[in-house]
């Protein structure tokens, strides 16, 4: 590792962004840089153009000669793109000879991937040899190609290769100038109007005159993090180079000093101590050069060597005294100084993976300034992002979660004490768009924070917003867009999930890492350009990229007021919290003052009898999303029912659930009860029958011995309000939870629920007799079991479209997703985001489901007489399953990671065998495909309708085909079909599936 820098060389003015300091930092810059002069004629706008291909008509080659360079990350369109090839050609023709001196090429900057050609050749007038050969840089902005001076009627640019992760390379613009264009001319052309206003010039003058209270700015120099999702920046985007720099703005463009050279490493972020003397930063020293998309490297669950993971370092402001603070084969990044002298950061040392993807999920930790006493503060089962410290001393950070809601939103803002107590929502836990708020920093002389508003998919760049939650924890009025050229609410209804940010419906912005200065001023990085901005969108660009790298994380070098040093809430401070993040097994206490607050008048006092305490179980093992096909060459995406792998439900809950138990609610609505510490838990308010009147669709967590209270069952935000030690007087000891009869473990449908149907329902509803088309037997099927398939999947796109990862967005497309006629469960696939806004009591689960009414009423016959009396305990099991959002598997572990959903068991040759047999023996009655259920019995295949219906009744079949097709089970074709299941049975004997009793003994 190097930490001695070479002397910085003067910036090259070969590109627009490198030119910005020289063009813009002049104190009295005129509205137009007269030294640049007018541009010569752009001959490309008069040419006839053609290309080797186009992605579609919206990306035709004519758009690349419009004379207008598309703004970065605008709505797609306005540029030319190839269709799925890394090379191609672009041709310009004129009817009369023209004098062409220079070509200027702009890469496809509207694409988040920065799809850029690499090597090129330029041929003039059908000459045999190219006139020019060269290589483009993978960057935004103009890149000039000088041409030999001669009359031309045709220019052909052969693009010989592209940079990695450029699936559809092309050009935002191709200009052909009659005279060489200077760098100054190109730069001036790109100066946006908001940097030429008197207010922008005054803003620059404030900085240069020192009236903002500082002269130097700390910066991180690195390549841009071009990544596939906001939660993968610890895995993707590593490209070596850069370091820590101190920039001094001056009239002539300023002085740039390197204080730490990252060498072959890369620094993501840095934070300056409150006294301005020390820097803590995250750096990865080397290893695999990973970039977008992660599908190319997803066989890597976590890098095994320390150097391939981000680690935290501390160094003095002059670059001396470097010390590494964290170690090990895990990522530690996003550090920020705490008022007590410690450091907060995120780490993925405790194994947890995104349920809908393949990467680890770092969460919030803290340590002393020297790296000692590292301990986990957050119990998130997904990812935490970009912590910083509020003026009141709490840590503010971004939290990604999806408790019974879609995965794309919501990455909202949360606050917590530096000791891990007092977790509270800050803003956005029910905001669908923007999908992500991150990089939050407190406004020093005002309320609220500045943050980046961005997407779920794509980079961590977007627009900049000021958020004041006093206007409402989810209210749009709380958000002020400080970059009005960016549509922070961009979303195409019917075309993609809210907050998703796919190419045609996302926020297009280049801003990241804002730092409020006070006086409605802030520093920010825009595409690697450091800007000084105000809240009225005036901007002054200070420093542009150099050496193919930009500048990020700007911070003024000056002492800062120290935020409040918090002592935190009541907790057991003798509890030893392991540095590796393991759960200690301790307990905490929750006190509910009045559970009816927020539920009245829809819920009457006295209705709620218990509170269920439920844990979201993390995905603790890595599962590759792409696996080898078992039926031929190549790879396949194994995600099913949304993005589930391993599969847990039919498009409902992503995570398995663990019910810790039930707490009794007093007549006045109060309750005090113990809960497990250090795990993500949420609550269900249950009526006297055990049905969930209201549910949390978020989670909280507590430290050992912590006491946390809430006013009631909030309708507007499901978060807990911390109660300071000494403010809370309990009437007695907190009650222990009543544990469920099946034990405290992952909720398994076959274990907990299926027995109810076996005892009370399958005598009538079985493979032979299916009143109403309902079979409630427990035979294992390809994904689940029969009763789960019938109750959960019937009437939904999960019957046949289980490979679909989503659906069009909005409640108006509920018909596309469908809903079970038996259970009102919550969709969580992409496109179903709006159901997070449907929060009325009894809207979901058992109170809204036909199945619950059948069980309550005894399933009356045509005379109104009950057919069955289901005991209270059995009914409660089924109600709870519905209110947990119908999980099937009680674990995210799998013995079959290579299968679809890491679960599916289906003979490879079953379909072909059935088709061949049917073509000979069933064609008289059945044209085309045989009638089949959308599920297939696996362990008892003889009970599938395609074997029962054609089998003679005398041989044990139903003979629903009329005349027997198979006179006996000895029929060769019957046996041939049956034998296709033999390999599956052998596999399951060797490696039981997670819904089999033998699973625990052999789980890998």
Enumerate the language-model features and the residues they cover.
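Aromatic- and Gly/Pro-enriched helix-to-coil junctions and flexible linker segments
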Residues: 34, 180-214, 239, 600, ...
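Disordered, acidic Ser/Thr/Pro-rich linker "stalks" and the adjacent N-terminal cap
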Residues: 37-100, 108-120, 135-137, 147-149, ...
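Short beta-strand-plus-loop segments that form exposed binding edges in beta-rich domains
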Residues: 158-165
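Residue-level detector of Asp-centered blade-edge/turn motifs that repeat once per structural unit
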Residues: 212, 274-275, 338-340, 390-391, ...
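Short, conserved, GDST-rich strand-edge loop motifs in beta-rich repeat architectures
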Residues: 219-239, 282-308, 345-360, 397-411, ...
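Beta-propeller blade signature
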Residues: 243-248, 308-318, 360-370, 410-421, ...
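Multi-bladed beta-propeller domains
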Residues: 252-266, 317-331, 368-382, 417-436, ...
């Amino acid at each position: 590792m190097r930490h001695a820098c070479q002397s910085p060389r003067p910036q090259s003015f070969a590109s627009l962004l490198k030119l910005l300091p020289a063009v813009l930092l002049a104190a009295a810059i005129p509205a137009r840089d007269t030294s640049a002069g007018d541009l010569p004629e752009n001959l490309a706008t008069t040419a006839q153009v053609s290309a080797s291909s186009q992605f579609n008509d919206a990306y035709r080659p004519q758009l690349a000669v419009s004379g207008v360079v598309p703004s970065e990350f605008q709505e797609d369109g306005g540029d030319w793109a190839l269709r799925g090839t890394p090379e191609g050609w672009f041709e310009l023709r004129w009817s009369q000879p023209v004098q062409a001196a220079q070509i200027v090429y702009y890469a496809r900057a509207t694409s988040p991937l920065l799809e850029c050609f690499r090597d090129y050749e330029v041929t003039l007038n059908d000459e045999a040899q190219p006139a020019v050969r060269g290589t483009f840089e993978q960057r935004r902005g103009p890149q000039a190609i000088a041409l030999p001076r001669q009359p031309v009627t045709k220019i052909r640019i052969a693009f010989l290769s592209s940079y990695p992760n450029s699936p559809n390379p092309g050009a935002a613009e191709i200009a052909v100038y009659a005279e060489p264009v200077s760098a100054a001319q190109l730069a001036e052309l790109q100066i946006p109007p908001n940097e030429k206003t008197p207010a922008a010039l005054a803003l620059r003058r404030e900085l240069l005159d020192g009236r903002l209270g500082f002269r130097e700015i700390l910066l991180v120099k690195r390549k841009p993090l071009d990544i596939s999702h906001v939660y993968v920046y610890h895995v993707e985007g590593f490209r070596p180079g850069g370091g820590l720099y101190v920039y001094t703005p001056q009239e002539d463009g300023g002085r740039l000093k390197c204080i730490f050279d990252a060498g072959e490493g890369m620094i993501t972020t840095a934070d300056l101590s409150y006294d301005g003397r020390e820097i803590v930063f995250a750096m990865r020293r080397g290893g695999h050069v990973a970039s977008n998309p992660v599908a190319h490297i997803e066989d890597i669950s976590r890098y095994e060597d320390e150097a391939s993971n981000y680690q935290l370092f501390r160094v003095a402001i002059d670059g001396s005294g470097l010390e590494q603070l964290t170690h090990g084969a895990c990522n530690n990044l996003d550090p920020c100084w705490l008022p007590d002298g410690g450091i907060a950061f995120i780490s993925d040392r405790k194994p947890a993976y995104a349920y809908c993807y393949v990467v680890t999920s770092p969460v919030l930790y803290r340590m002393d300034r020297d790296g000692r006493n590292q301990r986990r503060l957050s119990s998130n089962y997904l990812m935490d992002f970009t912590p910083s410290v509020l003026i009141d001393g709490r840590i503010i950070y971004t939290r990604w979660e999806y408790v019974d809601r879609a995965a794309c939103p919501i990455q909202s803002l949360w606050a917590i004490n530096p000791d891990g107590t007092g977790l509270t929502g800050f803003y956005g836990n029910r905001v669908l768009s923007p999908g992500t708020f991150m990089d939050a920093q407190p406004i020093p002389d005002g309320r609220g924070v500045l943050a980046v508003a961005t997407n779920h998919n794509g980079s961590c760049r977007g627009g900049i917003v000021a958020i004041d939650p006093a206007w409402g924890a989810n209210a749009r009025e709380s958000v002020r867009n400080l970059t009005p050229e960016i549509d922070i609410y961009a979303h195409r209804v019917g075309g993609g999930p809210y907050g998703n940010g796919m190419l045609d419906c996302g926020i297009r912005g280049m801003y990241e890492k804002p730092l409020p200065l006070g006086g409605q001023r802030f520093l920010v990085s825009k595409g690697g350009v450091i800007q000084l901005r105000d809240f009225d969108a005036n901007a002054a660009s200070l420093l542009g990229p150099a050496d193919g790298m930009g500048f990020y994380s700007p911070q003024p070098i000056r002492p800062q007021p120290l935020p409040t040093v918090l002592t935190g809430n009541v907790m057991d401070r003798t509890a030893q919290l392991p540095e590796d993040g393991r759960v200690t097994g301790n307990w905490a206490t929750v006190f509910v003052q009045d559970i009816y607050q927020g539920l009245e008048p829809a819920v009457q006092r006295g209705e709620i009898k218990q509170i269920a305490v439920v844990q979201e179980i993390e995905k603790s093992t890595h599962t590759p999303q792409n696996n080898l096909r078992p039926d031929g060459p190549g790879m396949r995406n194994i995600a099913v029912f949304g993005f589930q792998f391993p599969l847990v439900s039919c498009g409902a809950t992503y995570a398995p659930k663990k019910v810790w138990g039930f707490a009794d609610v007093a007549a006045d609505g109060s309750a005090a009860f113990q809960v497990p510490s250090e795990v993500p838990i949420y609550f269900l308010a249950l009526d006297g029958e055990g049905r969930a009147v209201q549910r949390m669709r978020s989670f909280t967590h507590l430290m050992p011995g912590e006491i946390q209270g809430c006013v009631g069952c909030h309708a507007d935000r499901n978060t807990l309000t911390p109660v300071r030690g000494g403010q809370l007087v309990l009437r007695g000891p907190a009650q222990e939870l009543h544990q469920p009869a099946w034990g405290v473990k992952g909720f398994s449908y076959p274990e907990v629920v299926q027995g109810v149907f076996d005892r009370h329902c399958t005598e009538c509803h079985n493979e032979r007799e299916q009143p109403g088309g309902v079979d409630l037997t427990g035979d294992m099927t390809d994904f689940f079991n029969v009763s789960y398939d019938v109750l959960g999947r019937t009437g939904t796109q999960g019957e046949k479209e289980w490979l679909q990862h989503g659906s069009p967005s909005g409640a108006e497309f509920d018909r596309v997703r469908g809903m079970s006629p038996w259970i009102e469960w919550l969709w969580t696939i992409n496109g179903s985001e709006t159901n997070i806004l449907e929060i009325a009591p009894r809207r979901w689960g058992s109170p809204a489901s036909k199945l619950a009414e059948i069980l309550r009423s005894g399933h009356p016959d045509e005379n109104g007489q009950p057919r069955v009396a289901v005991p209270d305990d059995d009914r409660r099991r089924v109600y709870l399953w519905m209110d947990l959002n119908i999980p099937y598997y009680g674990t995210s572990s799998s013995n079959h990671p290579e299968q679809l959903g890491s679960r599916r068991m289906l003979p490879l040759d079953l379909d072909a065998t059935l088709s061949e047999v049917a073509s000979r023996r069933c064609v008289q009655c059945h044209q085309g495909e045989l009638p089949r259920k959308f599920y297939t019995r696996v362990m008892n295949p003889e009970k599938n309708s395609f074997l029962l219906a054609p089998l003679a009744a005398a041989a044990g079949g139903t003979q629903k085909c009329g005349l027997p097709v198979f006179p006996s089970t000895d029929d060769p074709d019957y046996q041939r079909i049956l034998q296709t299941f033999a390999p599956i049975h052998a596999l399951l004997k060797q490696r039981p599936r997670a819904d089999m009793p033998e699973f625990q003994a052999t789980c890998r």
